[in-house]
Amino acid sequence: MKNVTDSFVYLGHWPSAGSFGFNTDILATNLINLSVVFGVLIFFGKGVLNDLLDNRKQRILNTIRNSEELREGAIQQLENARARLRKVEKEADQFRVNGYSEIEREKLNLINSTYRTLKQLENYKNETILFEQQRTINQVRERVFQQALQGAIVTLKSCLSNELHLRTINANIGMFGTMKEITD
């Protein structure tokens, strides 16, 4: 290794007029000097560059693996959320169906209860009307009977004398007597 560096140092001290050598002026470098520099960089920097690239590759692969794991976790969480959503939607549908059927049942119960109440009120109304009709008929009968009785009393008072009255009483007593004999 010492020989290689010595030869480079020796080449750097050659006279520059008409001879071959390294140009140490950075701004005036030529293609050969650049290729030698690149060769040295590649030879010595290859390991460092490979290590840097391997480290970068490992970081990228680790990032990809982490991203994949996060993606799989997110997919699993999404599936769990979808399953919960389906379950909740199913329960909501069940509650909705049960709610609608409960509402319909309550509606029918209310309609039936109202119908029964109206039927009872109709029956009470009919009974009240019938009672009032009977009461009115009885009042009319009583009034007609009273008027007829008063008319009969007036007629009897005007038509009956004491003698006629006594004969009617005796005739009625006689009829009751004969009826009593027949029944005995």
UniProtKB/Swiss-Prot annotation:
GO terms for cellular component: chloroplast thylakoid membrane; proton-transporting ATP synthase complex. It comes from the Eukaryota. One of its GO terms (molecular function) is proton-transporting ATP synthase activity, rotational mechanism. It is found in: Plastid, Chloroplast thylakoid membrane. It is a single-pass membrane protein. The keyword Membrane applies. The chain crosses the membrane at residues 27-49. CDD domains: ATP-synt_Fo_b. The keyword Cell membrane does not apply. Keywords: ATP synthesis, CF(0), Chloroplast, Hydrogen ion transport, Ion transport, Membrane, Plastid, Thylakoid, Transmembrane, Transmembrane helix, Transport. In plastids the F-type ATPase is also known as CF(1)CF(0). Belongs to the ATPase B chain family. F(1)F(0) ATP synthase produces ATP from ADP in the presence of a proton or sodium gradient. F-type ATPases consist of two structural domains, F(1) containing the extramembraneous catalytic core and F(0) containing the membrane proton channel, linked together by a central stalk and a peripheral stalk. During catalysis, ATP synthesis in the catalytic domain of F(1) is coupled via a rotary mechanism of the central stalk subunits to proton translocation. Component of the F(0) channel, it forms part of the peripheral stalk, linking F(1) to F(0). F-type ATPases have 2 components, F(1) - the catalytic core - and F(0) - the membrane proton channel. F(1) has five subunits: alpha(3), beta(3), gamma(1), delta(1), epsilon(1). F(0) has four main subunits: a(1), b(1), b'(1) and c(10-14). The alpha and beta chains form an alternating ring which encloses part of the gamma chain. F(1) is attached to F(0) by a central stalk formed by the gamma and epsilon chains, while a peripheral stalk is formed by the delta, b and b' chains. This is ATP synthase subunit b, chloroplastic.
